[in-house]
Amino acid sequence: MVKFPFMKIQMMMGMKIKENELFEKLKSFFPDLVQSSQFDSWDCFTAKHNTVIELKCRNVHYDELIIERIKWDALAHKRASEALGTIYVCWTPKGTWAWNLGSINAPEWHIKRLPRTTEHLARDWINKEVGYLHIDQATRVKLPE
C-alpha cells in the first residue's frame, strides 16, 4: 500500500497549481510515476506500487472535498478488476490530501449542478452525482517546493 509521509500541512496561500504541476511534485514520492492516456479514468500510474492515482486541484479549500461518482466507480472497477491500488490526491490552497480509496467506504451520493468540465471557459452546467471525502480520512501530503 502507498503511504505518504505525515508532515506539516503545506500552506500555499494565494497560489494555484495545475494537475501537471501536481503530477511533477508527486514524482518525488513515486519516481516511476507516468501519466495515463487522455482516455483513462485516472491521471497517473506507479508500477512499483501497482497504483493508479487521480489528481485534482481546487481553487478553494473545504474540509470535505468533492469526488464525482463516475470517477469513484471507475477507480473502484479498476481496483477490483486488476487488483490495483487507487489513490485520490487533491490540492487546495491550504494543502494537499491523499485518500486511499480502497480503505474507505464510498461516500453518501448527492446530485449537484456543476459545470460539465472545468477545462473550458464556456461552462455548460449539468447535474452530477457527487460525494464528499473529509480530509480527516486522508493523509496530508507535504509537497516539495
List the predicted regions and their residue ranges.
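Intrinsically disordered, low-complexity terminal regions enriched in charged/polar residues
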Residues: 97-145
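Active-site-adjacent loop/helix micro-motif of nuclease/hydrolase catalytic cores
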Residues: 59-73
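Basic, amphipathic alpha-helical patches used to engage nucleic acids or provide basic targeting signals
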Residues: 69-83
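Conserved catalytic cores of phosphodiester-cleaving nucleases, focusing on short active-site segments
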Residues: 44-61
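A structural signal for short, well-ordered beta-strand segments and their strand-loop junctions
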Residues: 35, 52-54, 87-90
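Acidic-basic catalytic patches of nuclease active cores, encompassing PD-(D/E)XK
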Residues: 1-38, 81, 96
